[in-house]
Amino acid sequence: MMTYEGKLIAEGLKFGIVAARFNEFITNKLVGGALDALLRHGVAESDIEIAWVPGAFEIPLVAQKMAETKKYDAIICLGAVIRGATPHFDFVSAEVSKGVAHVGLETKLPVVFGVLTTDTIEQAIERAGTKAGNKGFDSAITAIETVNLLKMIQ
């Protein structure tokens, strides 16, 4: 029986990050966490590019454009969608998650969903580097591992 498991080896890999400016207080912390993880695992700063988009809804389109350039080994998508008093949260959350998944399947490239979808600002803060860790860091680790896993399976 063959078992595959991705390694956390990132030297020489290139990463694109798509980050939403909306809820920038949160997203900046997610980007910081992602950069920390990538740099700790040997990615050169020159091998990381960040595209800032207005809001989470724009993430899938820009992620697809970045993936299509074939410059990156993975794309990390970061943002924060926080529930409000209207159904807007439900529409945005659903479309962003579907869009990010679609880009990965279409381009055969790891496209990691690191968009927080929380009920409160407090929950978002907890997931951006306090009580619940940093989901930006976690997303970068997922990207590294998935890149290496796909290389093993080919």
Curated annotation (Swiss-Prot):
Q: Where is the active site?
A: 88 (proton donor)
EC number, UniProt record: 2.5.1.78
Q: Name one Pfam family in it.
A: DMRL_synthase
Record's keyword terms, sorted? Riboflavin biosynthesis, Transferase
Keyword Transferase found: yes
The protein's superkingdom reads Bacteria
* Alphabetical list of InterPro entries matching this protein: LS, LS/RS, LS/RS_sf
Per UniProt, (2S)-2-hydroxy-3-oxobutyl phosphate binds at: 85-86, 127
Q: Record keywords: Glycoprotein included? A: no
Q: In which residues is 5-amino-6-(D-ribitylamino)uracil bound?
A: 22, 56-58, 80-82, 113
Q: Name one GO cellular component term.
A: riboflavin synthase complex
Query: Gene3D superfamilies of this UniProt entry?
Result: Lumazine/riboflavin synthase
What pathway annotation does it carry?
Cofactor biosynthesis; riboflavin biosynthesis; riboflavin from 2-hydroxy-3-oxobutyl phosphate and 5-amino-6-(D-ribitylamino)uracil: step 1/2
Q: Which GO terms describe its molecular function?
A: 6,7-dimethyl-8-ribityllumazine synthase activity
- Name the catalysed reactions: (2S)-2-hydroxy-3-oxobutyl phosphate + 5-amino-6-(D-ribitylamino)uracil = 6,7-dimethyl-8-(1-D-ribityl)lumazine + phosphate + 2 H2O + H(+)
Q: Name one GO biological process term.
A: riboflavin biosynthetic process
What does the protein in this record do? Answer: Catalyzes the formation of 6,7-dimethyl-8-ribityllumazine by condensation of 5-amino-6-(D-ribitylamino)uracil with 3,4-dihydroxy-2-butanone 4-phosphate. This is the penultimate step in the biosynthesis of riboflavin.
| Annotated family | Belongs to the DMRL synthase family.
Name the UniProt record assigns to this protein: 6,7-dimethyl-8-ribityllumazine synthase
The primary gene name is ribH
